[in-house]
Design a protein with these regions (language model features):
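Amphipathic alpha-helical polymerization modules
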Residues: 1-90, 162-267
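Polar, low-complexity export/assembly segments characteristic of proteins
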Residues: 2, 74, 78-188
Length: 267
């Protein structure tokens, strides 16, 4: 009985540790996805303002600033130096461009990403894994596509936003056609941020319950060692409600995954 109880206690502690790691990553991602969503909203506003004011002279500068910040977010690392949004390629920066001219020169926006395809998962219970990883290409493709479109048009014969005091007909038509994509990008990133927040809250609840589970098992082991098995089992049975609640929350985590909530990139 003692050996089985010690095994169960060690397993519960390990799952609690894994879940807390997942909570920490989801919390960090929440901050960064919120910032990325804000950048998408900035780009949408920059296009809208250019149309409303009949002046896009500052749009290239704003677009480059947004690219700088988005790249910094998507190439961020954890405490161990691993790229958060790189998937299994966590030792390689997932975003490979740093300037609008580089972005405009790509055949496809997908060439701007070098992340892997496997999203990070964490085992939080027996047979229960939760996907918490987010890929740079999943949340960054649409934003970089809009920036690529702007950079490509600006470099073309009818572009040159910075050199125009008022919008030409071609510039107006381009920005008008680009605005819906910018709106969709901002909406999708808001959805991704909310989805990550849901996963974070679910994991946080589970971590609390797993702490209860770990404490119960540790107490059970201590009781066996210091009292007798019969008394220990009686004490454990008295805590069945808390034990069942902790196990139920852990089991429900198998239904939680960012994959179920993130909109697919359209680029």
């Amino acid at each position: 009985v003692l050996e089985a109880a010690q095994t169960a206690s060690a397993r519960a502690t390990a799952y609690q540790s894994n879940t807390q790691m997942a909570v920490n990553q989801a919390d960090l991602q929440d901050t960064q996805l919120t910032a990325l969503s804000g950048l998408a909203s900035q780009l949408q506003k920059a296009i809208s303002d250019a149309l409303a004011n009949n002046d896009a002279s500052t749009l290239p500068t704003q677009a480059q600033s947004i690219l700088d910040q988005a790249t910094q977010i998507l190439n961020s690392t954890d405490a161990n130096g691993n790229y958060l949004y790189g998937g299994e390629k966590d030792n390689t920066p997932p975003v490979t461009v740093s300037t609008l001219s580089q972005l405009a020169g790509l055949t496809s926006v997908s060439d701007a990403f070098d992340n892997g395809t496997e999203k990070k998962s964490v085992q939080v219970g027996s047979g229960q894994s939760v996907q918490i990883g987010v890929l740079a290409s999943d949340v960054g493709t649409n934003l970089l596509q809009t920036l690529k479109d702007i950079a490509g048009f600006d470099a073309g014969p009818t572009g040159n936003f910075a050199g125009s005091t008022t919008l030409t007909s071609a510039q107006n038509d381009f920005l008008t056609s680009e605005l819906p994509q910018a709106v969709t990008t901002a909406t999708n990133l808001n959805t991704a941020t909310a989805a990550n927040g849901y996963v974070y809250n679910s994991l946080q609840d589970a971590a609390t319950n797993q702490g209860t589970l770990s404490t119960l098992y540790s107490g059970f082991v201590s009781s066996i060692q210091n009292v007798d098995p019969a008394t220990a089992i009686t004490q454990l049975n008295a805590n069945q409600t808390a034990l069942q609640a902790a196990l139920q929350v852990t089991a429900q985590l198998g239904q939680v995954s960012l994959l179920n909530y993130l909109p697919a990139p359209t680029g």
